[in-house]
Swiss-Prot record:
GO terms for cellular component: cytoplasm. This is Aspartate--tRNA ligase. The lineage of its organism: Bacteria, Bacillati, Bacillota, Bacilli, Lactobacillales. Keywords: Aminoacyl-tRNA synthetase, ATP-binding, Cytoplasm, Ligase, Nucleotide-binding, Protein biosynthesis. It catalyses: tRNA(Asp) + L-aspartate + ATP = L-aspartyl-tRNA(Asp) + AMP + diphosphate. Homodimer. Its main location: cytoplasm. Gene3D superfamilies: Bira Bifunctional Protein, Domain 2 (3.30.930.10), GAD-like domain (3.30.1360.30), Nucleic acid-binding proteins (2.40.50.140).
Length: 583
């Protein structure tokens, strides 16, 4: 029979109606000769009642045979419950079953199909189709669908054109490693799966499309963490003839619409703007979480005269104050914080506690001459904990920034109900790579330098600033964008600054440089990480929770066993020979 409605949508207004439902058995229980079944489908749970006095013996026998996750079809009459269950939307009614059909049986599942399970990540991924049956997972994907629907409606209304760009493209140096696809036709040659549609969307601007968007899969072969996957989805935008503020206005409107449509939240516009240098110096991060204070404070000049070489001879001394936390952290706890600080390059972590107006701790004796100034500078109060890092500026900022985030979580300083957006602007164009021994693009090599600093491309690259902007939400980089270079001579100059020879630049990017001979318009854009955005809206802490079939931390799929070996005949057809290094 045809299903009448979803089980989770049956309500009091359906009382007296005969309906047919289909779904999975959540649980079965007997009471006083009656059998009660929780029938689950994607919209929720409905209680079924099977009374031996009102059904045939065959129906009763089928009901007694049911186990969790059997797939069934039932027909019956909706009645009002004698005792309502206010914990579920269908709790005012139940279905008095008259017929029952078992559509399929099920083995005992490796974990219960319910929220809050304790199964390991790999077990959940191994049986992902079961994991996705759980209501909290299903709700995440309903949210994701609502987000993409809202995005498409917004961009369609602004006359953006949805264009699909190639999945098989050319390998170009963009930062992370490419996933390579060997060509059978052109043996010895490889496609790359795109890390982003960056160049192709710029070429669409040269084609006169004016406003492009795409919700697109991207691929990066990089080390994984909670908010990264080897394949991910981004909301990709590009526009012609707009400046950075106009592009930011469009993105702010998009985000405001998504939050209103999906969460019922009104977002205050415009978003705050913060310079990159300010973010690093006061938050220790280029993606600061502004839901709490605990700012980094520079004490370099104040501690120059103390009799403590770790401070007096350090390039920079910075500190954070954890208000009222002195009694929360024992020496052993601070040792753990010190070990954590060393992960970010710090040599150690100095600390003092405020105890009745006096400083206590290993370095307190060195600070007696500046106690009053230090107390005033840091606005210290009783029971405060002060953590110091003395090192190079970058190390001090990164270390204290990481500690700031960790301590805020441990101290419960974060209001999880807040959605704090901001723009990080005034970016450096380049960042120095110790590993490579050269400057690298902070974003990508197509970013437009500011008019005031472009002349440094032939000199001090540290002075070049970019017309770039990242959007940050609650300490996560939600997306990044920039105005792009549209003049051939400047693009060639940029490649040269990055260490490309003229031959290498034309080998890698000749098609883009050639396109710049044909009236390339001023343009710019942005990409938002869709997985990360939905993760934050859903209140999750790992993007695996909002990706249907993600990989684990080894970039593997425990369900399909991908990646896997392939037959030697396939390798021969591709003219490939695999040599494995000894482990």
């Amino acid at each position: 029979m045809k299903r009448s409605m979803y089980a989770g949508r049956v309500r009091k207004e359906h009382v007296g109606q005969e309906i047919t439902l289909k779904g999975w058995v959540g649980r079965r229980r007997g009471l006083g000769g009656l059998i009660f079944i929780d029938l689950r489908d994607r919209e929720g749970i409905m209680q079924l009642v099977i009374n031996p006095e009102s059904v045939e013996a065959e129906v009763m026998a089928k009901a007694e045979s049911l186990r969790s996750e059997f797939v069934i079809e039932v027909t019956g009459t909706v009645v009002e419950r004698e005792q309502a269950n206010d914990n579920i939307p269908t709790g005012a009614v139940e279905l008095q079953v008259t017929s029952l059909t078992v559509l399929n049986t099920a083995k005992t599942t490796p974990f219960e199909i319910k929220d809050g399970i304790e199964a390991s990540d790999d077990t959940r991924l191994r049986y992902r189709y079961l994991d996705l049956r759980r209501p909290e997972m299903l709700n995440n994907f309903k949210l994701r669908a609502a987000v993409t629907h809202s995005i498409r409606n917004y961009l369609d209304d602004l006359e953006f054109i949805d264009v699909e760009t190639p999945m098989l493209t050319k390998s170009t140096p963009e930062g992370a490693r490419d996933y390579l696809v060997p060509s059978r036709v052109s043996k010895g040659h490889f496609y790359a799966l795109p890390q982003s549609p960056q160049i192709t969307k710029q070429l669409l601007m040269n084609a006169g499309f004016d406003r492009y968007y795409q919700i697109v899969k991207c691929f990066r072969d990089e080390d994984l963490r909670g908010d990264r996957q080897p394949e991910f989805t981004q909301v990709d935008l590009e526009t012609s003839f707009l400046n950075e503020v106009e592009i930011q206005d469009i993105v702010e409107g998009l985000i405001a619409k998504v939050l209103k449509d999906t969460k019922g939240i009104d977002v205050t516009l415009p978003f705050p703007r913060m310079a990159y240098d300010h973010a690093m110096n006061f938050y220790g991060s280029d993606k600061p979480d502004t839901r709490f204070e605990m700012l980094l404070q520079d004490l370099t000049e104040l501690v120059k005269e103390v009799d403590f070489k770790v401070f007096s001879e350090a390039p920079v001394v910075k500190a954070i104050v954890v208000k009222g936390a002195a009694d929360s952290y024992s020496r052993k706890d601070i040792d753990k914080l010190t070990d954590y600080a060393k992960q970010f390059g710090a040599k150690g972590l100095a600390w003092v506690k405020v105890d009745k107006g006096e400083l206590a701790g290993p370095v307190a004796k060195f600070l007696t001459g500046i106690t009053e100034k230090l107390t005033a500078s840091l606005q210290l109060e009783d029971k405060d904990l002060v953590l110091f890092v003395a090192d190079e500026l970058e190390v001090a900022n990164n270390t204290l920034g990481a500690l700031r985030n960790r301590l805020a979580k441990e101290q419960g300083l974060i209001d999880e109900s807040k959605f704090n957006f901001l723009w990080i602007v005034d970016w450096p164009m380049f960042e120095w790579s110790e590993e490579e021994g050269r400057y690298m693009s902070a974003h990508h090599p197509f970013t437009l330098p500011t008019e005031e600093t472009a002349h440094h491309l032939d000199g001090d690259l540290a002075q070049v600033r970019a017309v770039a902007y990242d959007i940050v939400l609650n300490g996560y980089e939600l997306g990044g964008g920039s105005l792009r270079i549209n003049q051939k001579d400047m693009q060639e100059q940029m490649f040269k600054a990055l260490g490309f020879s003229a031959e290498d630049a034309h080998e890698q990017f000749g098609f883009l440089l050639e396109a710049m001979d044909y009236g390339f318009p001023p343009h710019g854009g942005l990409a938002i990480g869709l997985d990360r955005f939905v993760m934050l809206l859903a209140g999750e802490d790992n993007i695996r929770e909002v990706i249907a079939f993600p990989k684990n931390n080894k970039a593997s799929d425990p369900m399909t066993q991908a990646p896997s070996t392939v037959a030697s005949a396939q390798l021969e057809e591709l003219a490939l020979d695999i040599t494995l290094e000894n482990e």
